[in-house]
Amino acid sequence: MAVWAIGDVHGCRELLEGLWEEISPGPGDTVVLLGDLIDRGPDPAGVLWFVRERARTGRVVALRGNHEDLCLRWHRARSEADRGLWMANAGYTTLESYGFAPGDPAAELPAEDLAFLQAMPLWHREEGVVFVHAGLRPGVPLEEQDPEDLLWIRDEFYRHPEAFRERIVFGHTPFRRVLRNGPLVGIDTGAVYGGCLTAYEPFEERVVQVGAEDGGRFAW
């Protein structure tokens, strides 16, 4: 039974579909998406639909990323300043994928997709491996981590592998290739920026990638 982690998708539905076909998860397998399914790319709405449909019939864990969190805050916001933060982080691309024009006051995610985002956990642990969007604050137990760190932390986390014993698989910070730094494995390889969308199986150390620009598929 495999456990596949998938890095930041950012609206790249075609890449996600291609990668899913490559890893071909079976009935006993688990797929953990590390957050940031939405924003920036061409089809955030399609990505959410694709993941929701697979979650109905298979073991799929979709973690909350900082972009999902910004989206939820936008839907709760009461001031224009609060609402502007998601737009400044490419939230408009998600609304446009649902057919809303920029600035449409009626724009919002469908109730089913909004509920899906609200139910996303901040982390997942599977057989001693921790999966999280951005990372962990060194010296703080997993259960006591600040949600802001789980969603946003960068250098203070991945530059300090000596602070962690468990394998931690994370996204959020894009790298040209999979980052292996002690027990830390970063698999956001910048799909939406012309890189690859990466799937990683930590128990067998398998990596499968679908290339954004040339359609190439790589596995090792």
Region locations from a protein language model:
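N-terminal active-site segment of His-dependent metallophosphoesterases
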Residues: 1-48
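Active-site-proximal beta-strand elements of phosphoester/diester hydrolases
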Residues: 2-10, 129-135, 185-187
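Residue-level marker for buried hydrophobic side chains located in beta-strands
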Residues: 5, 31-33, 62-63, 130, ...
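Divalent metal-coordination and catalytic microenvironments
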Residues: 8, 36, 51, 65-66, ...
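Active-site environment of divalent metal-dependent phosphoester hydrolases
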Residues: 10-14, 39-42, 69-72, 138-139, ...
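Active-site neighborhood of divalent metal-dependent phosphoester bond hydrolases
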Residues: 40-122, 153, 157-159
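His/acidic metal-ligating clusters that form di-metal
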Residues: 107-132, 137, 142-177
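Acidic, His/Gly-rich catalytic cores of divalent-metal-dependent hydrolytic chemistry
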Residues: 146-220
